């Protein structure tokens, strides 16, 4: 039996994309698998009794070393903010190419804590900063210094000791441009360096909390239990800065979604599902429900989604009790039942679960998730208006039905903030600045393009058309990209009144491998990464299902 790939017109709706969850394809999981044979070292740990100072951690293999350089700083409580306008943080980090010299560390110490205001060099690859979860951090310090382990239930509600508020790469603020490193085999997968930075930052948080507790009361101090450490991740506060990425990188977005869709298709095509594979699926599913129950949020929107997800998963477990996995194509049968009987959130959740047993399917696809975007930048000027019209009618049918003469269809606009050069979303009718609008209203511009070519001759060459219509060059390019890359385009209006920007954030974060989505509004949220992951000195031997570990 051959299963068709799912229709992009269905999958690329934001309501569905915003229901994606971490999976075996997620970058932090594939990063750990790829780097399990690298040698981990803590090269420098020079903190004072209060935990302020410098530290260096590294991964090395053969002649290659990547080093995380950490700077822990003293700040007051009123200076601690997750907002992008913040200028001070509890700690600042940079991933350095090679082992930093004393001179490098001194140079970095002057610049890294300044973040965007500082200046870095081609030797630096990624940049980040993070703030303590003060309640969790102080609870752990107090517990360890008094000879007891911290409260697991309390920590499970937070999930981390620090949360990052930004991770920068690829040429930002002087960091190395991508062309310098893109041919390195070990980092050819998406966001490998960013994942490495966050993972090593996590280890720094454990070392720092142990160090402070030890100095506070050396007689009674005990070290943080390894099991508790494993089940703490790194938090992240993420806002609109992440959203335009998936619009601005259509071929990359396609490759992420296509890998997932290919994986699902191949799993559904497995004729004889082995008992051990079905058991892995069920075990991961049951463990994951335990994790969902520890997913805390103050957002009523997210509480309702979690409540519905748990209800749907319990329905599924009842169905599975009488399900015969020995039937031919049993995962396909299961998937079709889920699509018909459960909500979107649960459907996409189960897609992630169904991938778990199949390394042989997933591992090759991991290497298809990058993109050489410049190869597809040129517009085929010798193609015709007829070609373009056919593409628009086939690939953008739902978008062409949107009525942009209605006020609500144009309600929002995207712009770049002056002070932090970060993307923002504003109401076109209540706020100023629409003259600075960024070209992120793809649906509106596709519709405009379709109307513009309606009175053109079918035989007109695209190159000739663009001479008079240069303002639409960006969507002409996208249309021809969509011809080759079916999952490259969001099939929704990104400036309409019903836009939920958080769906765009969740999509990207699910591919990172984030869990515990905690929306603080429809424009920013907190998440957790690497919760349950092995510690760096345990990488050589660990279960690939670590993500389903739980503090509870």
Model-found features: residue ranges?
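Intrinsically disordered, low-complexity regulatory segments enriched in Ser/Thr/Pro
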Residues: 63-127, 198-214, 218-246, 255-258, ...
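Long C-terminal interaction/binding lobes of large macromolecular proteins
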Residues: 340-347, 381, 401, 417, ...
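Long, solvent-exposed non-transmembrane regions
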Residues: 2-19, 50-52, 65, 220, ...
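Residue-level detector of alpha-helical secondary structure
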Residues: 29-32, 138-141, 145, 159-162, ...
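Amphipathic, interaction-prone secondary-structure segments
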Residues: 32-89, 386-387, 391, 400-402, ...
